[in-house]
A protein has these predicted regions:
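Positively charged, polar, low-complexity stretches
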Residues: 1-137
Length: 137
């Protein structure tokens, strides 16, 4: 099985995470650099193997911190500016939660998307295995 290794020490924002995905997983392809497009990449066939792959996330503990509530607040503020007005109350409520240090973080969003493509996930046919590795001490 093909394995891709991303390094949490190389990024501290969602945009930089997307850059790392490009560098490691699909260096010759253009993609949307958003959560929906990342989900599409995990299906396979978009520069990634149809039969699935392992995603190894080095320094995942660092990513958990860097992609925590401050980055989540920043992302939700951006989303609030761009979203359709019918979604604004929902996004504003998420933003209030994040400002209070509650709810899912950007790190959680990414993990949920990846795990949805693995064993027991709604899109398990993608056969993506996630391995989180802490920083080596």
């Amino acid at each position: 099985m093909t394995a891709y290794r991303i390094d949490g020490a190389r990024f501290s924002t969602l945009e930089e995470f997307f850059d790392e995905v490009t560098r490691v997983m699909i260096p010759d392809d253009f993609w949307g650099h958003n959560l929906d497009a990342f989900d599409d990449i995990l299906h396979g066939g978009f520069g990634t193997p149809d039969e699935g792959f392992e995603l190894i996330w080095d320094n995942a503990d660092l990513s958990r911190d860097r992609l925590g509530y401050p980055e989540t607040v920043r992302q939700l503020e951006l989303r609030l500016k761009r979203c359709h007005r019918s979604w604004r109350p929902f996004v504003a409520a998420q933003l209030d939660q994040a400002r209070a240090g509650q709810g899912d973080t950007v790190f959680d969003w990414l993990i949920e998307i990846i795990e949805d493509h693995g064993p027991g996930g709604r899109k398990s046919e993608s056969n993506v295995t996630l391995t989180l590795r802490p920083a080596e001490e």
